[in-house]
Amino acid sequence: VAYSVQEVPIEFVNRAWPDVEKFITTSVEYADGEFTLDEVKARLVQGSWALVVAVDESNTVRGVATVAYYNRTDHRVAFVTNFGGKFVSNPDVFSQFASILVSKGATCMEGAVRDSMLRLWARLGARKKSTNIQIIL
């Protein structure tokens, strides 16, 4: 199955929400309380995060990613905040996704992932960069 990957313009996030919500819901379950579904939607409609979808030939959403961009001294980072569905299914989908990130100025992509996602991403060239910790104060 061939997928087309495209960024959803901010003015269409609300219209796209019913088609992407189920994918994001699954991803939020693994976020360990970092954000809720409502917070994801708020960040998308406010433009803090970008929404990227993979659609099939009939324009049905098959995968979703949300991305937050930020700048470091040596990179413009595209930090993937959510993945859901068939988004990382093959090199072609990733290539299309990477092209979108580059078009937004990104020089690298990062994300916080479970071990199973790391194994999946490793097939596309990802490497483990660090391990995050958290202490509630």
Question: Which residues fall in each region the model found?
Answer:
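Active-site rim helix/loop that mediates acceptor-substrate recognition in acyltransferases
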Residues: E29-W49
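Short glycine-aromatic motifs
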Residues: W49, R123-K128
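Long, low-complexity, intrinsically disordered polar/charged segments
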Residues: A31-F35, V61-R62, R72-T81, A98, ...
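Structural motif
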Residues: L44, E57, S99-L101
